[in-house]
Amino acid sequence: MVDQLSPSAISWERGKTKSQIAIGVSKMPTEILASVSPSCNGESETHMVELPLITPNDCTLLLIDQQAGLAFGVESVARQTLLGNVVALAKTATLFELPIIASTSASTVYSGPVMPAIQAAIGDVKAVERRNMNLWEDETARAAVVATGRKRLLVSGLLTEACVSFPVLSAIEEGYDVSIVADACGGLTPESHSLALRRMEAAGATMTSWIQVLLELQRDWTRHETYAGARGIVEAHAGGYGIGLSYARDMIHPPQP
């Protein structure tokens, strides 16, 4: 397989006992990573493993306690910025048809329902109400995750120190591959938010952002079935990057009269 690729498609890091060759595979059905290491006779051996990139077919989005009553306590990030990030993530999951599990706690006595802007982005998805701070210890909520049949989780929620970190640690212990969408999570203080992220990362979670999730799922701007939707999300929520895309569309390639 490697011999069939052009040199420009392969990059390696020399000088190490074991190096990884990243292979451009935009035209292939699955992404692969070739790991090259010397064998006992001095010759290189090539092992093929999957790249750790998410696809629309292998991950589930968990939206945990995205409720106004809990957002009031967030001090790790500007609340409006956080809300915009979560909405962008929710729109992305909807566009790429990911299973979405929303869960709430104390919705009728304090926290309120899923925030309206987020609910609008996920359509008719109904939140699973629970009492336990750890979603993984709630039978109904955990069953909803298991029922998707997917072992890769994207997690966004409030608060990072508890209702995000507890189920993440539990899911990792059960063998799930968990990515924390860190800019779509909020904590009580910048320090406690950061410490919670560090604890989850130490346990094996991967840190990511909503824009990386979108770009990782899209990957190729010639994927026309999601191009317009992905571009619309970027233009609405990705700051200067979105402004640049809008400019390119309107000025460099203006619509024909």
State what each model feature region is:
Residues 87, 139, 161-165:
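Glycine-rich phosphate-binding loop at the start of an alpha helix
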Residues 6-19, 26, 35-39:
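Low-acidity, Ser/Thr- and Arg-rich intrinsically disordered low-complexity segments
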